Amino acid sequence: MQMGVAVLVLVIACGVVSVLFAIWAIRSVLAADQGTQRMQEIAEAIREGASAYLTRQYSTIAIVGVVVFLAAWYLLSISAAIGFLIGAVLSGVTGFIGMHVSVRANVRTAQAASLSLAGGLELAFKSGAITGLLVAGLALLGVSVYYFILTVWLGYSPSDRTVIDALVSLGFGASLISIFARLGGGIFTKGADVGGDLVGKVEAGIPEDDPRNPATIADNVGDNVGDCAGMAADLFETYAVTVVATMVLGAIFFNGSDILSSVMLYPLMICGACVITSIVGTFFVKLGVNGSIMGALYKGLIATGLLSIVGLAIANTLTVGWGEIGTVAGKSITGTNLFLCGLIGLIVTGLIVVITEYYTGTNKRPVNSIAQASVTGHGTNVIQGLAVSLESTALPAIVIVGGIISTYQLAGLFGTAIAVTAMLGIAGMIVALDAFGPVTDNAGGIAEMAGLDPEVRKATDALDAVGNTTKAVTKGYAIGSAGLGALVLFAAYSNDLAYFAANGQTYPYFADMGPVSFDLSNPYVVAGLIFGGLIPYLFGGMAMTAVGRAGGAVVQEVRRQFREKPGIMTGKERPDYARAVDLLTRAAIREMIIPSLLPVLAPIVVYFGVLLISGSKAAAFAALGASLLGVIVNGLFVAISMTSGGGAWDNAKKSFEDGFTDADGVKHLKGSEAHKASVTGDTVGDPYKDTAGPAVNPAIKITNIVALLLLAVLAHMS
């Protein structure tokens, strides 16, 4: 036990180091030069808009959070309610601080890029690393400190239901914040982007980030609340939920075993070791002699991955060791096999990154095919973009299937859980790559609006093009890890259900349940699969509709300002930027509520609906379990298709900004008919990749974690 406490303290220390590194990086970024007075004025407008939106968003979520907190206290326990509060607050804090730094780093990055490309890269990446290491550090601290309080201070057994319910509630708190942040931020950012592009680029013929466009500031605000705060909340949730689900599986599989404490600590130690490797990896991000920005970022990612292999070995040595640790479902589990499962998780991460970059990177076949299709018109651009989005699901799915089967063969479902934990262990570096994107995008916008030298805009455009790819790559990683993480949650659901059924005397609600079968000959299972499968499509449709409405409102507002203030186009009148920001803030908050509640309420509706119709608890639990699988499978494909397809559409549009040479050798420049067709495709792809697709991620996980909590509530009530 003393060794276990020492390991837990070491894990907590790793989380503290991550947060301290982020604080050091914040001080370093804020000490950088902010540039000219005009640059600072533009940055201040972006900062005010982002802060106003996020404050209003979190105020709205807080109302829902208070209701859920009281419900968790009443239906479960005070420890579960506190767990929910910890998950929700830390998720919100991560996004808020990350965005707070991002909206201050943008102007500093623009100024640094005016001096050198290497300087701009260093500052933008350091800003991204702050968000990344806050995500990893605070998620690790949230789970490990609360686990320490429950098991060491309060003396609960690691497998006690109080501990498990409290940790699952912590994951639910993170999930609830995540789905609101992802969806609300996505509606804001893409409403601004779509509305601004349609009127500014297509109708008025002015370039991106032109200060004459009334939606320009709103667009830059959206980059931060969507790609920075939204992604931070998303991966914070995935990180926390995956670690919790792995610990829950460990508690179920090894209950009563001498090694139970070590098994519960193993995923925490993996994350603790990997957060340190992520910190070290940030120092490898340096621009090389070839000037490749993507190469510089990949150096950091590869270094983190290789060092994490050593981290996995350390985690094994300090917790489960290398020999046999037990038998689960007739399969012998060894420490060596668990290490190999962690290694497979890192390999899956690498493959997903490479595949996503292929489908979204400039000068790659998929993006070039969309650019080529733009030459023949708007319709062919959309058709080819949809084709690429559908095709982009195949290879990631094969990689994920390979990861599931290989880890299951090595160590059963617990091995799969360890693989996902290893994937999430390097989330600090992955989020750093993602948060790099909005900083460079904003830096380019500030350079354009402040009228800086074209060479500065050239440097920020180079950073932004890479940032666009890193955002797509990290979305692919987030979706892959979310799909595997949801599978671990489903395993926790099915095993938790079996545990309650086997202990009917302690949990009377489950005593007369009868056997639960997930056999496909069971009509309730098929019905559950179909119902679960519709959720990602319905959710995605609601998200796209919300962006369409928000974007339409922006179009009307921008047209109104151009009509009523003709001096805007000549530079004699200043656009009312604040009006578009306020309009989008109200629209995003209003539009995010109903879609966000869909995946939260769906599991409850499935269970009680089938119970009411069939009168059988076993049928209701079978239908609920099947619906979770339906959400996982369809959600995985919908999310990958939308994010990769949208990223490809975006970079196809960017291909025309320096001139795209088609198959016949004709060069098409910005403003050409082919470029206008590519803007249309990007208008479709924007809400695909930045609103609906990413928001499906937390929707997949929240349905599973609500199902787990439903089991806990029914057990507690009995």
Swiss-Prot record:
* Major subcellular site: membrane
Instruction: Tell me which cofactor or cofactors this protein depends on.
Output: Mg(2+)
Q: InterPro entries in the record, alphabetically?
A: PPase-energised_H-pump
Q: Which residues are listed for Ca(2+) binding in this entry?
A: 650, 682, 686
Site (Determinant of potassium independence) residue list: 471
One Pfam family name is H_PPase
Which parts of the sequence bind Mg(2+) 1?
A: 193, 197
- Residues at which substrate binds: 190, 689
- Please provide, alphabetically and separated by semicolons, the GO molecular function terms listed in this UniProt record: diphosphate hydrolysis-driven proton transmembrane transporter activity; inorganic diphosphate phosphatase activity; magnesium ion binding
- What general EC class does the enzyme of this chain belong to? translocase
State the reactions this protein catalyses.
Answer: diphosphate + H2O + H(+)(in) = 2 phosphate + 2 H(+)(out)
Task: List the keywords (alphabetical).
Answer: Calcium, Cell inner membrane, Cell membrane, Hydrogen ion transport, Ion transport, Magnesium, Membrane, Metal-binding, Translocase, Transmembrane, Transmembrane helix, Transport
Does rRNA-binding show up as a keyword for this record?
Answer: no
- Please list the residues that bind Mg(2+) 2: 220, 223, 441
Q: Where in the cell is it found?
A: Cell inner membrane
What kind of membrane protein is this, topologically?
Answer: Multi-pass membrane protein
- List GO terms (cellular component aspect): plasma membrane
Q: For this UniProt entry, which segments traverse the membrane?
A: 6-26, 54-76, 81-103, 112-132, 133-153, 168-188, 240-260, 265-285, 300-320, 335-355, 385-405, 413-433, 472-492, 524-544, 593-613, 620-640, 695-715
EC number, UniProt record: 7.1.3.1
Against PANTHER family, the record matches this protein to:
K(+)-INSENSITIVE PYROPHOSPHATE-ENERGIZED PROTON PUMP
State the family named in the UniProt similarity comment for this chain.
Answer: Belongs to the H(+)-translocating pyrophosphatase (TC 3.A.10) family. K(+)-insensitive subfamily.
Role according to the record? Proton pump that utilizes the energy of pyrophosphate hydrolysis as the driving force for proton movement across the membrane. Generates a proton motive force.
Assembly with partners or alone: Homodimer.
The identity of this protein, by name, is K(+)-insensitive pyrophosphate-energized proton pump
Q: Which organism is it from?
A: Brucella anthropi (strain ATCC 49188 / DSM 6882 / CCUG 24695 / JCM 21032 / LMG 3331 / NBRC 15819 / NCTC 12168 / Alc 37) (Ochrobactrum anthropi)
List the gene name: hppA
